[in-house]
Amino acid sequence: YFPVSPYAFCAGNPVNLIDLEGQDIWEINSYGNIVRHLKTTRSDAFFMVDEYGNRMIGDNYSIEFPYKTVVQQNSYTYLDDEKGINSYDVYRVRGDKNGTALFEFLADNITGSPTKVEIGQIMTGLEGDKGLNFITTSHTERREAGLMKLIRGQIGYGYTIREVNHSHPKDAFPSGLTGSDEQGNGGDMEAIKLLTNSMISCGAKVASFHIYHVPTKRKIPYSVKS
């Protein structure tokens, strides 16, 4: 699920830690942390690494995109109620197919691992090759704080948000349907209600919301009426 941020929709701005341009290689561990970052002008690529930092073997553990597909990578810090100071990573990816491919690659390898760390995807702008996708992770088991914080802290202002997706390691339904999730929060249902109301109050079209269910690789829609 993605917990609620204290940042107001259409306002607020977290602290920017890292601002990296594209044309890179990223080596990522099962928590979604960037273990190594290598500069290259050949392509944009991601490799999963094991607990020792070694690249994992197999076609499912790497993905490659044309040069400058990843427009930018940023990391932000925030105060988490449970973990204290925490951070979340954001990859800005050009093109809906590319953004979805990276989102599902990271979800399959990270959310689908024993860490159960969730991944988020925000699809903005024009649909198709010109769309700008934001792929997020806050490196936390069964939670994705980056989605909510990014929307309410930055891209809720000045971006047309078309779709908001996040991964689930097990449940094929949104958290919070019974009032609270395992952590005692309103979970996905509280978040979608707040975001929907915020979009309406800002005069924006309400985005569509989906869960990417990793065990079945299905994209499951949900709404405030779920």
Predicted regions located by residue number:
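Short consensus segments that form the blades of beta-propeller domains
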Residues: 108-115
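Acidic glycine-/aspartate-rich tracts in secreted/extracellular proteins
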Residues: 14-15, 41-42, 127-128, 168-172
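Active-site-proximal loop/helix of nucleotide/amide-processing enzymes and allied scaffolds
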Residues: 20, 25-39, 145-226
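Extracellular structured ligand-interaction cores
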Residues: 6, 117-119, 206
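Short turn/helix-capping motifs enriched in Asx and small/polar residues
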Residues: 1-76
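Short beta-strand scaffold segments in enzyme catalytic cores
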Residues: 118-126, 210
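Charge-patterned, phosphorylation-rich low-complexity C-terminal interaction regions
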Residues: 77-100, 104
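Structured interaction and signal-relay segments at domain junctions
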Residues: 69, 78, 135-145
